[in-house]
């Protein structure tokens, strides 16, 4: 492959195998199940004591599903995650349980959970007999948590559950010894971006801010840019390929305007542009075929059409023959004197009299005989070879001696030259050579930085929102200077949309511009921005397995409702529903009696 030319991988997800839980998961104590329920991808696995902290979750799949409409393979049931294979042919059928990052369709969420439990090898009968650690959105609505708790306790019969925020679990995993410290978490995912202040290990929910932009919007923006740039390849510029460009070829510019000026230089453009190779066919139909190949192709098409017509005639003949046999059988009933069966058969055939039956038999017999004759004639025609109508060309071997004689005579003619007017030169047809691959390439230049830039400048896609830097400045201004200094010493980046090269350097530049002169700050990128949330939830589950202060049991769910939440270092803040107090019946009765007494006194005074 040439320099800066990258083919699209078009990766197709392989179906997940049904795994075995193993002896560790079936120990004397129930082993927790850890589910990172993300809007882009679901990650599920076991939190086994003594497990190597390195292995990835045993199950990772896209949080989408599609209901089949039948087909050749009869796959009419719902397909989930990696079982879908390539997403592009099914893009119009894909459904997600999430609205932004909040699960709202619990029917689809149940499909994701069924898929997770089945492929993890949960073998308990009638229920999921394991505690569950489940991630939820920042400031998750109470109704969403209530529906999720109802699904887990009523449908799956789990013993207990704990909810937490994915970015806080990632923070917990990267700072296990300083989990009670303060800091600022910048979490950017598939649907939105959050800036979360942490004070002494707990989320300061009233100062959290959300930006409704993430990796999904960046992929959509990149798709629109390239479709406008290459309208001829509109169908080939798919969302899956745009996500591939984002994940593998995009980066964050430390200074966006200065980087755009660099791209104006032709040498810089030539050295840094990424040429994405689209799939294409190197053989052009109709232009590379010889006349003999075209003739052979026409003959094949003619044979195929004749065979198709013959097959249809045979099928029609078979149906007519079966109907004729049925009519002849009914006629035999009449000849044998079985009148009851004969009249019953006439009614089934929707006929009124034996004469009508006889007339129909004659017509059908003629049609069957004609169809047989056509089939025989078609078979004879198939055996006849197609005669080539092209005129025969002279034998080249016979022409070669005469051509040599003419050339030798021209050598002795002093007046003859190839430049003589009236003498035609031999025409040599030069076929131009085209590099077809170059006509199927997407030149991704400034788009490499424009797409991920939207989380810093939402105005690029017309969103009236503040970017990360403005949101960060707004949150810091709400705290005293000493707390500001404490927060900026621990700025933590996590989430799949922070994996762009240059993200950390860009945040350091933004903080340098907004902080006072010679002040210090520290920016840290998660060791694995995608999987650290699951790792942190697993670590938290193992460290708090016997701590009843953080787990919601079934009894507490039944007593306090599905929206109930127990707070911990990685959870949301629980704000219970406050219903207005209703006046008691006794107070209502006293108020009504006082009103009636006052009304009666007034009437007497007026009288």
Swiss-Prot record:
SUBUNIT field: Component of the chromatin remodeling INO80 complex; specifically part of a complex module associated with the helicase ATP-binding and the helicase C-terminal domain of INO80. Interacts with DDB1. Interacts with ACTR8; the interaction is observed in asynchronous (interphase) cells but not in metaphase-arrested cells indicative for a possible dissociation of the INO80 complex in mitotic cells.
Cell compartment(s), UniProt: Nucleus; Cytoplasm
Organism for this UniProt entry: Homo sapiens (Human)
Record bears the keyword DNA damage: yes
Keyword field: Coiled coil, Cytoplasm, DNA damage, DNA recombination, DNA repair, Isopeptide bond, Nucleus, Transcription, Transcription regulation, Ubl conjugation
Gene name of the encoded protein: ACTR5
Subcellular location, principal: nucleus
Species classification: Eukaryota, Metazoa, Chordata, Craniata, Vertebrata
Leader sequence residues: none
CDD domains the UniProt entry points to: ASKHA_NBD_Arp5 (cd10211)
SMART domains, per database record: ACTIN
Biased composition (Gly residues): 597-607
Family: Belongs to the actin family. ARP5 subfamily.
PROSITE patterns, per the entry: ACTINS_2
Physiological role: Proposed core component of the chromatin remodeling INO80 complex which is involved in transcriptional regulation, DNA replication and probably DNA repair. Involved in DNA double-strand break repair and UV-damage excision repair.
Cellular-component GO terms for this entry: cytoplasm; Ino80 complex; nucleoplasm; nucleus
Protein's name according to its UniProt entry: Actin-related protein 5
Cross-link (Glycyl lysine isopeptide (Lys-Gly) (interchain with G-Cter in SUMO2)): 283
Chain coiled-coil ranges: 288-327, 355-384
Comp. bias regions, Low complexity: 584-596
A Pfam family reported for this protein in Swiss-Prot or TrEMBL: Actin
InterPro entries with a match to the protein in the record: Actin (IPR004000), Actin_CS (IPR004001), ATPase_NBD (IPR043129)
Sequence segments annotated as region (Disordered): 584-607
GO biological process: chromatin remodeling; DNA recombination; double-strand break repair; positive regulation of DNA repair; positive regulation of DNA-templated transcription; positive regulation of telomere maintenance in response to DNA damage; regulation of cell cycle; regulation of chromosome organization
């Amino acid at each position: 492959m040439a320099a800066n030319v990258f083919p699209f991988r078009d990766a197709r997800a392989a179906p997940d195998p049904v795994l075995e839980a193993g002896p560790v998961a079936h120990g004397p104590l129930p082993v927790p199940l850890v589910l990172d329920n993300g809007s882009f991808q679901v990650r599920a696995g076991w939190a086994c004591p003594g497990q190597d902290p390195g292995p990835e979750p045993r199950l990772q799949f896209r949080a989408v599903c599609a209901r089949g409409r039948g087909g050749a393979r009869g796959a009419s049931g719902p397909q989930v995650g990696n079982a879908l294979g390539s997403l592009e042919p099914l893009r119009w059928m894909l459904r997600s349980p999430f609205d932004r990052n909040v699960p709202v369709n619990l029917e689809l969420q149940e499909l994701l959970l069924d898929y997770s439990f089945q492929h993890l090898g949960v073998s308990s009968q009638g229920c999921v007999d394991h505690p569950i650690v489940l991630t939820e959105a920042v400031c998750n609505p109470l109704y969403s948590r209530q529906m999720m708790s109802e699904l887990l306790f009523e449908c799956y019969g789990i013993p207990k559950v704990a909810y937490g925020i994915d970015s806080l679990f990632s923070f917990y995993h990267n700072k296990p010894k300083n989990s009670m410290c303060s800091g600022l978490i910048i979490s950017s995912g598939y649907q939105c971006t959050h800036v979360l202040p942490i004070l002494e290990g707990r989320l300061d929910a009233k100062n959290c801010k959300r930006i409704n932009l993430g990796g999904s919007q960046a992929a959509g923006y990149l798709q629109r840019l390239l479709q406008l740039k290459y309208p001829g390849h509109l169908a080939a510029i798919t969302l899956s390929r745009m996500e591939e460009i984002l994940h593998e070829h995009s980066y964050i510019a430390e200074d966006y305007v200065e980087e755009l000026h660099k791209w104006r230089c032709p040498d810089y453009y030539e050295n840094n542009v990424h040429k994405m190779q689209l799939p294409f066919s190197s053989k052009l139909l109709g232009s590379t075929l010889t006349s003999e190949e075209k003739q052979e192709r026409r003959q094949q098409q003619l044979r195929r059409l004749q065979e198709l017509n013959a097959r249809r005639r045979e099928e029609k003949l078979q149906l007519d023959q079966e109907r004729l046999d049925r009519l002849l059988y009914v006629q035999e009933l009449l000849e044998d004197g079985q009148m009851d069966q004969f009249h019953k058969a006439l009614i089934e055939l929707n006929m009124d009299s034996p004469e009508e039956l006889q007339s129909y038999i004659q017509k059908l017999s003629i049609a069957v005989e004609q169809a047989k004759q056509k089939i025989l004639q078609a078979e004879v025609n198939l055996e006849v070879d197609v005669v080539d109508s092209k005129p025969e060309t002279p034998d080249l071997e016979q022409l070669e001696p005469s051509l040599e004689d003419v050339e030798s005579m021209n050598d002795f003619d002093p007046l003859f030259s190839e430049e003589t007017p009236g003498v035609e030169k031999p025409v040599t047809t030069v076929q131009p050579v085209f590099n077809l691959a170059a006509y199927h390439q997407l030149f991704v230049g400034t788009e490499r930085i424009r797409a991920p830039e939207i989380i810093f400048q939402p105005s690029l896609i017309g969103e009236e929102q503040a970017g990360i830097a403005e949101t960060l400045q707004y949150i810091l201004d709400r705290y005293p200077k000493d707390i500001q200094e404490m927060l900026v010493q621990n700025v933590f980046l996590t989430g799949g949309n922070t994996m762009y090269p240059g993200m950390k350097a860009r945040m350091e530049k933004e903080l340098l511009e907004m902080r006072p002169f010679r002040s210090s700050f520290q920016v840290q990128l998660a060791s694995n921005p995608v999987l650290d949330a699951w790792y942190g939830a697993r670590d938290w589950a193992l460290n708090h397995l016997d701590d009843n202060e953080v787990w919601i049991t079934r009894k507490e769910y039944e007593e306090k409702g599905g929206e109930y939440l127990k707070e911990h270092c990685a959870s949301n803040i629980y704000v219970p529903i406050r219903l207005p107090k209703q006046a008691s019946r006794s107070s209502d009765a006293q108020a009504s009696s006082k009103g009636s007494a006052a009304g009666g006194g007034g009437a007497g005074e007026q009288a």
